[in-house]
UniProtKB/Swiss-Prot annotation:
InterPro entries: RNA_pol_sigma_r3/r4-like, UPF0122, UPF0122_fam_protein, WH-like_DNA-bd_sf. This is UPF0122 protein ABC2295. Belongs to the UPF0122 family. Coiled coil: none annotated. Might take part in the signal recognition particle (SRP) pathway. This is inferred from the conservation of its genetic proximity to ftsY/ffh. May be a regulatory protein.
Amino acid sequence: MLDKTLRMNYLFDFYHSLLTEKQRNYMSYYYLDDLSLGEIADEYDVSRQAVYDNIRRTEAMLEEYEQKLRLLEKFETRRSLLAELRKAIASDQAVEACNSLIDRIEKLD
């Protein structure tokens, strides 16, 4: 399992277009630029609690999008299968293993 920051960064990459501009800005400042709640609050002239609440709600939204669309899950599965494919190519049973992995990758979508 990915640590929370890395997971949120991935979810943000996949689903940022579904967020409002304010949500994108808060998440970007907090997770990508590593700004504190206080720094973000100063930038937007709001309370730290308002920033915290917005970020937590946005995190929940991103998790909900992932439950429905599973883009991160498919990405991780695809990456894992491609790593197996690279390993299989280097082995003796390359043809059978590669065909099997290709079939699994094709079934992801």
